[in-house]
Amino acid sequence: YDDESNPKRAAQLAERLISQDKVEFMLGPYSSGLTKAMAPVTEKYGVPMVEANGASRSLFTKGYKYLFAVLAPANLYLDVAIKTAVELNGGKGVKVAMAFEQDAFSQDVRLGILDAIKETGSTKVIDDKLPKELNDMAATLVKVKQMKPDVLVVSGHTKGALTAIRQIAEMKVDVPMLAMT
């Protein structure tokens, strides 16, 4: 079946797979949004769902008994970048520039970075919101050149990451550490 990357359709198909096709377990869909839509259905029927592509922290705070993940939640994806930068800086806090898309996954990554900044005594110098269809990061990168952070963190999925890498090179942005999803 094709969920068409539509959460409502994914939930309907989960219902069909369980109630009509009599599946005994499910492999989760791609993305946190689709997993969020399907999890209540699998819970309702007590059908285990093993997922490898839904990393939003909110999936793991709902108390689901039948949802199992094989990856870390999104808030833990890039916090190690901040901790590593601090370690390389002799244990002293670092300046962090952040730019995140406004989807659930990227916002969970952002929360993990904010936690790491606080935990390490680091400083947030840029906290930009990126559009869903990221085509241009120039405004953020101009600020990065001005503020000279120790770390730049970007969460914009494949297209956003490719855009960031291309524009960082084109604009000759020099940042000691770059971390991306």
Regions found by a protein language model. Give the residues of each.
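Beta-alpha junction/loop-to-helix N-cap segments that form part of ligand/metal-binding clefts
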Residues: 1-61, 70, 130-137, 157-163, ...
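Short active-site oxyanion
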Residues: 23-26, 149-152, 174-177
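Alpha/beta-hydrolase-fold catalytic nucleophile elbow
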Residues: 155, 180-181
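Cofactor-binding loop segments of dinucleotide-utilizing enzymes, especially the Rossmann-like FAD-
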Residues: 3, 101, 180
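Extracellular/periplasmic Venus flytrap/periplasmic-binding protein
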Residues: 57-58, 65-172
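Short hydrophobic/aromatic-enriched beta-strand-loop microsegments
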Residues: 46-53, 121-125, 173-180
